[in-house]
Amino acid sequence: MPQLNPAPWFMIMLMTWFTYSLLIQPKLLSFTSMNTPSNKTTSTTKPTPWTWPWT
């Protein structure tokens, strides 16, 4: 079964991924984030307990 022999296609797959990552990575890193992170602390609210009708 030729599918079990990784020699013919494994290097092609690796080179394709390396090529795509080298071409796409600069494009993705050039995007700027529109929402700047803030130092605001998150406030947690305490939930009210559920009143069960049968208790």
Curated annotation (Swiss-Prot):
Q: Could you state a single Gene Ontology molecular function term?
A: proton transmembrane transporter activity
Record GO cellular component, one term: proton-transporting ATP synthase complex
Keywords assigned by UniProt, alphabetized: ATP synthesis, CF(0), Hydrogen ion transport, Ion transport, Membrane, Mitochondrion, Transmembrane, Transmembrane helix, Transport
Q: According to Swiss-Prot or TrEMBL, what is its membrane topology?
A: Single-pass membrane protein
The record ties this protein, via InterPro entries, to:
ATP8_metazoa (IPR001421), ATPase_protein_8 (IPR050635)
Which subcellular locations apply to this protein?
Mitochondrion membrane
Q: Does the keyword Zinc-finger apply?
A: no
Which residues are in coiled coils?
A: none
Pfam families, sorted = ATP-synt_8 (PF00895)
Q: What is its main location?
A: mitochondrion
Span-the-membrane segments of this chain are 8-24
Question: What biological process terms from GO does the record include?
Answer: proton motive force-driven ATP synthesis
Q: What does the protein in this record do?
A: Subunit 8, of the mitochondrial membrane ATP synthase complex (F(1)F(0) ATP synthase or Complex V) that produces ATP from ADP in the presence of a proton gradient across the membrane which is generated by electron transport complexes of the respiratory chain. ATP synthase complex consist of a soluble F(1) head domain - the catalytic core - and a membrane F(1) domain - the membrane proton channel. These two domains are linked by a central stalk rotating inside the F(1) region and a stationary peripheral stalk.
Summarize the subunit comment: Component of the ATP synthase complex composed at least of ATP5F1A/subunit alpha, ATP5F1B/subunit beta, ATP5MC1/subunit c (homooctomer), MT-ATP6/subunit a, MT-ATP8/subunit 8, ATP5ME/subunit e, ATP5MF/subunit f, ATP5MG/subunit g, ATP5MK/subunit k, ATP5MJ/subunit j, ATP5F1C/subunit gamma, ATP5F1D/subunit delta, ATP5F1E/subunit epsilon, ATP5PF/subunit F6, ATP5PB/subunit b, ATP5PD/subunit d, ATP5PO/subunit OSCP.
Q: Which family does it belong to?
A: Belongs to the ATPase protein 8 family.
- Annotated protein name in UniProt: ATP synthase F(0) complex subunit 8
Q: Which organism is it from?
A: Coturnix japonica
Ranked from the top, the taxonomy reads: Eukaryota, Metazoa, Chordata, Craniata, Vertebrata
The gene name reads MT-ATP8
